[in-house]
Amino acid sequence: MQWLREAKIPVGIVSNAQFYTQPIFESLAGTSFKTLGFDDNFLEWSFQVKEGKPSRVLYERLAESCEVRGIDPRGVFYVGNDLQKDILPAHEVGFLTGLFAGDKRSLRIGDVPFESAASLADAVITDLNQVREVVKLG
């Protein structure tokens, strides 16, 4: 994520999270989300809006946060591992999408054949370092 910070590209999270997720994560990691490179303006937690993925509400809120800060949502690259809960709703609000298929355990595509799931995303990512290639920054 260092190269994203250096390029001044904001990084956010959309998560089905409980109220304790952030403080527990930060306690276990020994650092804050901000220190890790996440921008507070782009953190969407389901418990805050009482809506969970795959609801478009979280993604619409993120798109609004982008627009308010002069970022075109069509230029946002959203990476997720779940076809139904990440890729489809992110695509519906206009984000470019990357299906994370780094391992079979985390990849969630349901009964959809992989090739079909992959075709619904703008890119397939098997390693987070590939994000750099997708956003064409070096």
Language-model segments: what does each one mean?
Residues 2, 9-138:
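Asp-based, Mg2+/Mn2+-dependent phosphohydrolase catalytic module
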